[in-house]
Amino acid sequence: MFALVLAVVILPLWTTANKSYVTPTPATRSIGHMSALLREYSDRNMSLKLEAFYPTGFDEELIKSLHWGNDRKHVFLVIVKVNPTTHEGDVGLVIFPKYLLSPYHFKAEHRAPFPAGRFGFLSHPVTPDVSFFDSSFAPYLTTQHLVAFTTFPPNPLVWHLERAETAATAERPFGVSLLPARPTVPKNTILEHKAHFATWDALARHTFFSAEAIITNSTLRIHVPLFGSVWPIRYWATGSVLLTSDSGRVEVNIGVGFMSSLISLSSGPPIELIVVPHTVKLNAVTSDTTWFQLNPPGPDPGPSYRVYLLGRGLDMNFSKHATVDICAYPEESLDYRYHLSMAHTEALRMTTKADQHDINEESYYHIAARIATSIFALSEMGRTTEYFLLDEIVDVQYQLKFLNYILMRIGAGAHPNTISGTSDLIFADPSQLHDELSLLFGQVKPANVDYFISYDEARDQLKTAYALSRGQDHVNALSLARRVIMSIYKGLLVKQNLNATERQALFFASMILLNFREGLENSSRVLDGRTTLLLMTSMCTAAHATQAALNIQEGLAYLNPSKHMFTIPNVYSPCMGSLRTDLTEEIHVMNLLSAIPTRPGLNEVLHTQLDESEIFDAAFKTMMIFTTWTAKDLHILHTHVPEVFTCQDAAARNGEYVLILPAVQGHSYVITRNKPQRGLVYSLADVDVYNPISVVYLSRDTCVSEHGVIETVALPHPDNLKECLYCGSVFLRYLTTGAIMDIIIIDSKDTERQLAAMGNSTIPPFNPDMHGDDSKAVLLFPNGTVVTLLGFERRQAIRMSGQYLGASLGGAFLAVVGFGIIGWMLCGNSRLREYNKIPLT
C-alpha cells in the first residue's frame, strides 16, 4: 500500500558553469537526464511524469545536480509518491517560470473593459502570469493530474473532436431560436435597472429590464480548471449556480463570454465543460516534450465560441459520441429555452428506464450540461441584446429547482433530503424577488381567497411562487394551490383529459404542496400533502391514464426543438403525482395501444417509424413514467405517509405496494398482490388467483396482521340526509382479472349524490351500466371498514321480527272486521229496511 508523501522543493537555478557535476545516484541520473532534455524549452511551461528510484532524503548534492547551466528562468517542483518500506516510487517534475516567485496581484477594474453586445471587444480571458503566491495557484502544487492519473486521454491525437452537425455555423452564429420569438423592447421604453415585481400584471405582460448590471457589477476572477490540467483562466464573472446532493454535484461559473461547468458523480470521474470566445486558446498542462503547446480536448472553434471538454482521460466508458454531443451544446443555440427543452426531453426519457436505486449516468451528464448551457445562453443573450425579461428570470429559477430535483433523484440516485441548489446570478436577485412576491401574496384580500379568476392567472402565480420559494410558501400561495387542485379534480370527474393550461397549473400546485423542506413538523403542511396525494391518485383513473399517456407520446413524437419548447409541465398528468405503481400492467398498456388509432397523427408517426414490438415497448415505457415520478419517491412517502414504513416494514421501500391511499392521519389503505405482513387485511373475492388483490388498512401503531370481513349490504341512500354520509370514503373499481381501474375520493355532497345515482350517474366510473359484468366495486371507509357496493336503499325501512309483523297484521285485520260490523249495524241499509221490534210473548 503506497503512502502519499508530498515534498515540494522550490529552488531558483543558479549558474554553475565553473563547477563540476556531482557523481549522481540512480535517482540523480534519471532526474538530471530529464532536466537536460528540458533545457532547450526553458521559456515554456512544462510538466513531466517519470519513473525513478531515489534515496529517502534530498541532499545538497542531489539538488545541485539539477542545475541547467546558465538558465536562471525556472524552478523545480518535485512531487514524491513513496513506499515507506522499499523506498521506491514515482517522481513527478513540474516546471514553472521563475518570475512566478514575484507576487503579482490583479487590479479589478471598476467595469469590464468591453461594452455589451460586442463580441469583438471581449477581453482575452486567459492569463499565464498568475502569481506563484496567489491562492489560485495552489491546485497546481498539489495536483494529481499526471501524477496519480491523467485528465486527458493518453493519446493527443484523439483530443480533436469533430464539430457536431447541430453546432453553430457562420450562417447561424447564434444557433436555433424557438417560437415564439423573444420579444424586443418597444420604442421609447425606459428599462428598469433590475428585475422586480411591482404588480401581478408584471407576470401577464412582458417586463423588460436592463442588462447593464453584467457590465457594471461583473468581477474579475481566476478559474482553475479540473485538477489543474489547464493553466488558469481569468474572466469577468457574472454569476454562478451550484447543484448538489449526496451523489452528484454540478458547479457552474458564468462570465462574459465564458462558462465553466464542472459535473461530477459519485459513480464516475468528473468532467468539465469550458466555453471561451472563439479566438481564445487554452494551454493544457501535459507531459509532452514537443515544441508546440497542446490545446485541451475539444472541437474546432465556431463563429462565436470555442468549447473544451476536460476529464474522462482514462475512462473509456464515456462514448466519443456522447462527448461530441456535449461539446456541441453551447453552440447549438443562445436561446436558453432550447437547452431547457432538451433537458426536459432527456429527463422524461430517463424516467422510462429508471428504478428508485438506479443511476442513469449518461443522462445525468447530458441533463447537467444542458442546465449549465441554458444559464450561459441566457446570460449571453441578455448581454448581446442589452436587456432581460422578468418572465425569463422566473422561468430559469423554476427550471433550476425542478430539473435539479429530477437530475439528482433519478439521474444520480440521490437521497432527496440531500438535494439542494443555489444560484447567484448578477442579473437577478432571488431574495429580493421572493420578498416582493410575498408582499403581493400578502395583499390578496380575504374575499378573493376562495376563488381564482382563471387557470392562466393561477398558473403564473403558482409558477412564480414555486420558482422563488425559499422553503416556506406564503399562506395565500398554499391556499391557491389547494383550490387549483380541487377545481381540476372536480372537472376530471366528468371528463378524461386536461388542456395544457390546466396541466401546467396542476403541476405547479402539486410541486408547492408536495415538495417542501422547512416546517416538516407542521401538521397542516403534511395534511396538505396527504390530501394532494389522495386527490392526484383519484384523478388517475384508467381512462385518464390512457389519455395522459397519449399526450406524452404526442409530445415526444411531434418534438421539434428547433421550433417549440417542450417541458414536462406541458404534458403533466395527475398520474405523475399519484401513488399508483400498477399502470405498467398489461391491461393498461393494452388500453393505451388500443387508443392510439383515436389520434390519427400519432398513429401514423408511430407506425411509420416503429415496428409493432417497438410500439409496444414505447407504450410500456410511457406508462412507466407515471409509476416512477412520485410513487417511488421515498422522501415524499416518508414525509406524508410515514405509517407505511413503521414496524420495520420494508414493503413500501421494496415497491411491493401497487397503490397507497392516505386515510385519516396515521392510517392508510394499501393494495398489494403479496401476502401482507401487518394491518387489517381484506382479500377481494372473485379475483384471478394469479393476480390477487389484498386491501390492507395500515396503522402506524399496529404491527400485527388481522383478516377483515368485507360487508355486503345495501347502503342507506344519502339523499335522506343533509350531511355527507360518505365523505372521506374511497370508491374502488376493479376487474375480476385483478386489474385496478379507478380510485375516487368522495369529497363532497355532490360527489356523494353522483355515487348514489348509480346507473344515472354522470361520473363514468360510478355508472355500472358503462362497464361489463367483470367490473366490481367496493367502498373503503376512513375507519378501515370495507363494503361491497351493491346499491343504495331509497328509504330506510323499520326492521321488525316475523312474529311481531304477523301479530300486528292479524290484530289489524280483526279490528277492521269488528269496526265494519259495528258500522254496518249502525249505518248499514237504514234507508232500505225498517227496524222491527222484537216480539213479546
Curated annotation (Swiss-Prot):
<keyword id="KW-1032">Host cell membrane</keyword>
<feature type="glycosylation site" description="N-linked (GlcNAc...) asparagine; by host">
    <location>
        <position position="783"/>
    </location>
</feature>
<feature type="glycosylation site" description="N-linked (GlcNAc...) asparagine; by host">
    <location>
        <position position="317"/>
    </location>
</feature>
<keyword id="KW-1160">Virus entry into host cell</keyword>
<keyword id="KW-1168">Fusion of virus membrane with host membrane</keyword>
<feature type="topological domain" description="Intravirion">
    <location>
        <begin position="824"/>
        <end position="841"/>
    </location>
</feature>
<dbReference type="GO" id="GO:0044175">
    <property type="term" value="C:host cell endosome membrane"/>
</dbReference>
<keyword id="KW-1133">Transmembrane helix</keyword>
<keyword id="KW-0730">Sialic acid</keyword>
<keyword id="KW-1043">Host membrane</keyword>
<protein>
    <recommendedName>
        <fullName>Envelope glycoprotein H</fullName>
    </recommendedName>
</protein>
<dbReference type="GO" id="GO:0046718">
    <property type="term" value="P:symbiont entry into host cell"/>
</dbReference>
<keyword id="KW-0812">Transmembrane</keyword>
<dbReference type="InterPro" id="IPR035305">
    <property type="entry name" value="Herpes_glycoH_C"/>
</dbReference>
<feature type="signal peptide">
    <location>
        <begin position="1"/>
        <end position="17"/>
    </location>
</feature>
<keyword id="KW-0732">Signal</keyword>
<keyword id="KW-0261">Viral envelope protein</keyword>
<feature type="glycosylation site" description="N-linked (GlcNAc...) asparagine; by host">
    <location>
        <position position="45"/>
    </location>
</feature>
<comment type="function">
    <text>The heterodimer glycoprotein H-glycoprotein L is required for the fusion of viral and plasma membranes leading to virus entry into the host cell. Following initial binding to host receptor, membrane fusion is mediated by the fusion machinery composed of gB and the heterodimer gH/gL. May also be involved in the fusion between the virion envelope and the outer nuclear membrane during virion morphogenesis.</text>
</comment>
<feature type="glycosylation site" description="N-linked (GlcNAc...) asparagine; by host">
    <location>
        <position position="499"/>
    </location>
</feature>
<dbReference type="InterPro" id="IPR003493">
    <property type="entry name" value="Herpes_gH"/>
</dbReference>
<keyword id="KW-0472">Membrane</keyword>
<feature type="glycosylation site" description="N-linked (GlcNAc...) asparagine; by host">
    <location>
        <position position="760"/>
    </location>
</feature>
<feature type="glycosylation site" description="N-linked (GlcNAc...) asparagine; by host">
    <location>
        <position position="522"/>
    </location>
</feature>
<comment type="subunit">
    <text>Interacts with glycoprotein L (gL); this interaction is necessary for the correct processing and cell surface expression of gH. The heterodimer gH/gL seems to interact with gB trimers during fusion.</text>
</comment>
<keyword id="KW-0325">Glycoprotein</keyword>
<dbReference type="InterPro" id="IPR038172">
    <property type="entry name" value="Herpes_glycoH_C_sf"/>
</dbReference>
<dbReference type="GO" id="GO:0019031">
    <property type="term" value="C:viral envelope"/>
</dbReference>
<dbReference type="GO" id="GO:0020002">
    <property type="term" value="C:host cell plasma membrane"/>
</dbReference>
<feature type="glycosylation site" description="N-linked (GlcNAc...) asparagine; by host">
    <location>
        <position position="18"/>
    </location>
</feature>
<keyword id="KW-1162">Viral penetration into host cytoplasm</keyword>
<feature type="topological domain" description="Virion surface">
    <location>
        <begin position="18"/>
        <end position="802"/>
    </location>
</feature>
<dbReference type="GO" id="GO:0055036">
    <property type="term" value="C:virion membrane"/>
</dbReference>
<keyword id="KW-1039">Host endosome</keyword>
<keyword id="KW-1169">Fusion of virus membrane with host cell membrane</keyword>
<dbReference type="Pfam" id="PF17488">
    <property type="entry name" value="Herpes_glycoH_C"/>
</dbReference>
<dbReference type="GO" id="GO:0019064">
    <property type="term" value="P:fusion of virus membrane with host plasma membrane"/>
</dbReference>
<dbReference type="Pfam" id="PF02489">
    <property type="entry name" value="Herpes_glycop_H"/>
</dbReference>
<feature type="glycosylation site" description="N-linked (GlcNAc...) asparagine; by host">
    <location>
        <position position="217"/>
    </location>
</feature>
<feature type="transmembrane region" description="Helical">
    <location>
        <begin position="803"/>
        <end position="823"/>
    </location>
</feature>
<dbReference type="GO" id="GO:0016020">
    <property type="term" value="C:membrane"/>
</dbReference>
<feature type="region of interest" description="Interaction with gL">
    <location>
        <begin position="246"/>
        <end position="309"/>
    </location>
</feature>
